[in-house]
Amino acid sequence: MPGDYYQTLGVTRDADKDEIKRAYRRLARKYHPDVNKEPGAEEKFKEINRAYEVLSEPEIRQRYDQFGEAGVSGGGAQGFDVGNMGDFADIFETIFGGFGGGMGGQQRGRRRANGPTRGDDLRLDLQLTFQEAIFGGEKEIRIPHLESCQVCEGTGAKPGTGVKTCGTCNGAGQVRRATRTPFGSFAQVSACPTCNGSGEVIEQKCEACNGVGRKQETKKLKITIPAGVDDGTRLRVGKEGDAGLRGGPAGDLYVFLMVETDKHFVREGMNIRSNLEVSYLQAILGCRLEVDTVDGKAELTIPAGTQPNTVLTLENKGVPKLGNATIRGDHLITVKVQIPTRINSEERELLERLATIKGESHGKGGLEGFLGGLFHK
């Protein structure tokens, strides 16, 4: 399974086109098979090329940001932009960087400790029914997250007070400690324990958030599930993750979809499969039957002489294409012919006459054997 293309190129998700191009050129030179003969270099070179192919094109990159690999691959798992479906920025991928354990994530990249810091991304697993995945719709979710403190407006300082330079590190954010050893003196530099590397301390902490600047809250969100999503689809909801620190932007919310199985239907890409049991007479003579589809009842023609396991097609009754719901797959129905194990005397008489007409011997194997043979003529 492909990894995260941003990680492959070593750039952040907000990298511009020039940054992506520079990263690609640097890595392409490093891993080009003509230059690098180490095992795995050629495969790495292919990954780099694929990542650049996706991230260098704005439209493809947008789909990747929304659906991850599924948004840029073929078939029924292509990406879908929900930016036009409400206030949410966009939407998945199966596995990607930036998540830690539980609902929180790791901050991306190393930033100045006293500068604005982007909030963590959050992950939520959401269960959908088979029908919800096919046709989409709105779902209400509840998300525990860190929200910017309204009392101190995220500063962590008590209203009316501010911050001052840390007296321990004099604003440097680091402290230096010398250690004497038999081999000489060594200097060890570490983050200031007083200001945690920010270089500043709050004069008086905000009582509402205890000086943190953020509070744990649970919020309700309504998200739009587009038609045609599949098990493992990732929806990205922009800026609905944890609030940032010191004026930094909020992280994103990633919703991973888990689709329940259905007792009647099986999904294969954009197609839906199901079985239909018919009697041997219906298979021999043909008929029209009502069958279940995801859209409700539909009429299906069973041609005369239909063989067991014949697959019949109901066009445009399958899964809508992700991002273009006007295009749909088909519903493929496998015909299962029921051959009776017991028949009454009247049925036997009629079948014996039929066997005589066809010139079939039905002594060996009985009439049941004769019936089975009818479907292979």
From Swiss-Prot:
- Report residues binding Zn(2+) 1: 149, 152, 206, 209
| CXXCXGXG motif repeats mapped onto the chain | 149-156, 166-173, 192-199, 206-213
Q: What is its main location?
A: cytoplasm
Domain of life, source organism: Bacteria
A biological process term (GO) from this entry: DNA replication
For activity, the cofactor(s) needed are: Zn(2+)
Cellular component GO terms held in the UniProt record? cytoplasm
Zinc fingers classed as CR-type: ranges: 136-218
Q: What InterPro entries does this protein map onto?
A: DnaJ, DnaJ_C, DnaJ_domain, HSP40/DnaJ_pept-bd, HSP_DnaJ_Cys-rich_dom, HSP_DnaJ_Cys-rich_dom_sf, J_dom_sf
User: What keywords were assigned to this record?
Assistant: Chaperone, Cytoplasm, DNA replication, Metal-binding, Repeat, Stress response, Zinc, Zinc-finger
Where's it found, cell-wise?
Cytoplasm
Cited PROSITE patterns = DNAJ_2, ZF_CR
- The J domain is annotated at 4-68
Functional note: Participates actively in the response to hyperosmotic and heat shock by preventing the aggregation of stress-denatured proteins and by disaggregating proteins, also in an autonomous, DnaK-independent fashion. Unfolded proteins bind initially to DnaJ; upon interaction with the DnaJ-bound protein, DnaK hydrolyzes its bound ATP, resulting in the formation of a stable complex. GrpE releases ADP from DnaK; ATP binding to DnaK triggers the release of the substrate protein, thus completing the reaction cycle.
What family is this?
A: Belongs to the DnaJ family.
Which PANTHER family does UniProt cross-reference here?
CHAPERONE PROTEIN DNAJ A6, CHLOROPLASTIC, DNAJ HOMOLOG 1, MITOCHONDRIAL-RELATED
Q: What information about domains appears in the record's comments?
A: The J domain is necessary and sufficient to stimulate DnaK ATPase activity. Zinc center 1 plays an important role in the autonomous, DnaK-independent chaperone activity of DnaJ. Zinc center 2 is essential for interaction with DnaK and for DnaJ activity.
Entry's HAMAP family? DnaJ (MF_01152)
Q: State what protein this is by name.
A: Chaperone protein DnaJ 1
Origin species = Synechocystis sp. (strain ATCC 27184 / PCC 6803 / Kazusa)
